Amino acid sequence: DPMLQDSQGFNALHLATHSSNAMLVLYLLMAGEMPVDTADTLGHTSLMWAAYQGDSLSVQILLKHGARVDTKDREGFTPLHWAVVKGNRECLSKILMAGADIKAGDKSGKTPVDMIKELKGTMIWDKALSDAKLSSDGQTRRTPFDKLMVLFPWYIALPLAVAQFLFGHIGAIKFLLRTRTPNDMLQTPYYTAVFQSTAFWVGFVWLRYLLGNTSHLLWMNIAFFVGYTSALYFFYGAVMADPGWTKANSSYESQREAVVQMADRGLLDARHFCVSCIAQRPLRSKHCKFCNRCVAKFDHHCPWIYNCIGAKNHRAFLIFLALFLSSVPIYAYLSFEYLHVLSPSYVPVSSDPCLLGDTLCGYFQYDAFTTTLAFWSLFQMTWPGLLFLVQLYQVGQAKTTNEAMNFQRHSYLGKSMTIRQRILRSLTEIDSEMAGAGHPLQEESINLLEANGTATNDEDEVTLFAQEESKPVGFGDHEGHNHGARRAGGGGMWNLLVGTARRRRQQGEDRDVNPFDFGLWQNCVGFWSDGTQGPMRGVNWYSFYEAEARGGAATSRRM
């Protein structure tokens, strides 16, 4: 009986929490249907223990199952008091978001705020309040939504223009949006508003000033119009699109069934199961903490489009970047041609000297707004240009940004060749119509497998990824938790061009770098055809799983 208690009042749920085994906590609550707020002999609930240990995943699970945040132990400590003792920001944030009272006192009247001051954890406390969107007194922080349009006069003096820009930027994020941390900014449409406002003024200036005064550049204007409108089309396509939300289990019964099934298969762990969505994680998916959803083939969360980039909108995002980068130089050329044709010779003003040279000073003197907007648009090419190059490189390597940045964390990357063989076998054996005996897809996949993964000589050593063993988080005398990863190697561009996921032998085991890499050409064909062509055509990333049972063999399947 998991509800039996020992001499200290600990039941199975307490012990699972002590060992920071979040998946066992989830299993006991859903399969065992244990009461969540049972206290031990000292009045400590499982939520208090999880908060004290800084186990944010267990805290999240317990809160989702109705754990109370207002319970007190024998000393009058609430779960928030214990979270303050540990000082873990995520635990503090989750408990505050659950409605914990920051003014609740213990037997001596000491509140969590008093304790945080004594422990000198004010900085973490402020960040946790910001995460929970609370003010310093624990009240919900209000953000004004009044629309305000202010037209500032444009001065020639560049320092004043820069100061104006900084004032507007800082004023918006500090007083209008009332953000405290960079993460707060990512949860607002501020960055995408910067782009959209720039796009609006670019279109307005082109229609109002440039089009009529540069009519001799007919094809340049046509090219700009096509590029501008197409870029906006794909931009809003990426913004408004479903990036690839995976299906979450909505009912309690379906959630319970999913937990039990994963536990029976030995796969109830954070790598294969999302405790936020209470659903199995498809291969290459990730739970976005900003959107609070799991995204199939997750690439990254992009604040510039206020959306995630995933299976459904990745192509639209890259097409937008390409069109944007090709349209901005055309717009700048039209702007400077307009200024060159119409601006008179610069007339120096003794009281207001200009140090930019006669040409630029003349442009600013004639039309400061258009000149500034042209330079601002060129400046805006920096981040999309770098991002576009990185994205193209990753497409050529068949990696997502998430995989490239967290390579050592993914079980299907850096694994042995058997992972690649299972993936190819799932693609060539499941669908009899597409992958029957002798079908070109099957032959192509097998040939690519042989070309990309059979070399084992030390001469082929290019990249090594090795992950050290992780020790589980313990309680009491148990050892702590730490990770380690090592990376060495080179020749990434050569790998990209020839498409070989070369390996090196470590401790007698061959290591494959990326099971999805079939070479530059095949990777690009698969990406730009939206998975309808190439060796991995027909893959449904919403139900494509690679799961490795504890002590068993990995399996892959396509549905």
Swiss-Prot record:
Transmembrane segments: 148-168, 192-212, 217-237, 316-336, 373-393
Residues of the DHHC domain: 272-322
Chief site of localization: membrane
Pfam family, one: DHHC
Alphabetic keyword roster: Acyltransferase, ANK repeat, Endosome, Golgi apparatus, Lipoprotein, Membrane, Palmitate, Repeat, Transferase, Transmembrane, Transmembrane helix
Gene3D superfamilies: Ankyrin repeat-containing domain
Xref: SMART domains: ANK (SM00248)
Lipid bilayer topology: Multi-pass membrane protein
Active site positions: 302
Family affiliation: Belongs to the DHHC palmitoyltransferase family. AKR/ZDHHC17 subfamily.
Written domain comment of the UniProt record: The DHHC domain is required for palmitoyltransferase activity.
Protein name stated in the entry: Palmitoyltransferase AKR1
